[in-house]
């Protein structure tokens, strides 16, 4: 239920960028509007992820997921009924506010039900849900628009799916083991690394004491945040802008341009899963060395982009698949790794705090991208993404070094 819910959240987020080429021709929206709306979305999303993380450490995770899915479904359907640019801004902002509270409950569930020595692979499986949702969104949206001839169907269909899944989630998602009369996961799994983290997490601290000592003044958290912001800049550029670039510059059809994003997400699905398993089994929960290997592969891939973009669709699709594979390794490992370096009871808070800065990074792939494009064309956008990837790699190298000390 957690897996499908997370996939549906992404389905109702990425349908907007998938529908954008059609909306640019069928409505009065401009590329500048898209950039501004994207930045607003990511800022609001990050802020609400922070708030949601704080809330979920105190309440039942199931009390958030189902109602939020229902709300997101309603907003998407209303978006399809709208025609004014002002309404688009308002509804997309409301979608961001609701979507921002989507992941912290899932992070809390993962931290509560899976121990440290297995968390990498299980987290990777849940993280794969957004690759599936992100992969299906451009295809489902493109076919819905192509079948109906209107961009509106690209919001009606995902909205209806979200409504249905929200009702299912109300009955299927469970709270933490302790509330169901079960032992904590470290005892049940007999995991010494999990028990050590529990032992190092005092139980009589206030929320503020935990936040200050284990998050705000934790240097490892800040290095993770810098790396995560950078990977979000790169991910958002590679996820939100190629369909516009290929449709406008190379004249690709909507389905063809959006299919590149599906290949990117399909590669990300495999990369995230493999990174989780490697970090658990081969690298003994060392998330950072695992992530560094993936980041180095991503550096190689991004350098190859200018060499294949004007050749063939097949080569472009292959490269985007490999880039997705390489990028989603660090993307997933930053998320699970931050749980390993903080208080056991702060899973929601650290996820929300990290998410606040992650989506500042995502917002930096909105308006700043259109500013870079207007000044230095698409080659400037490419260099911007390259710099973000290099910063991600440096952050992982530093974390890997500190892990060995």
Identify the residue ranges that each predicted region occupies.
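Residue-level signature of mid-helix packing/kink "hotspots" within the transmembrane helices
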Residues: 14, 42-50, 134-135, 265-273, ...
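Extracytoplasmic gate region of multi-pass secondary transporters
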Residues: 16-20, 218-273, 331, 365
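Conserved MFS/SLC helix-loop-helix module at the cytosolic interface between two early adjacent transmembrane helices
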Residues: 47-83
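Cytoplasmic membrane-interface "Motif A"-like loop-to-helix N-cap segments
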Residues: 58-69, 281-295
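C-terminal ends and interior cores of transmembrane alpha-helices
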Residues: 70-83, 296-310
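Cytoplasmic helix-loop-helix junction between adjacent transmembrane helices
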Residues: 91-132
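Helix-loop-helix hairpin linking two adjacent transmembrane segments in secondary transporters
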Residues: 126-178
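A late C-terminal transmembrane helix in Major Facilitator Superfamily
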Residues: 344-375
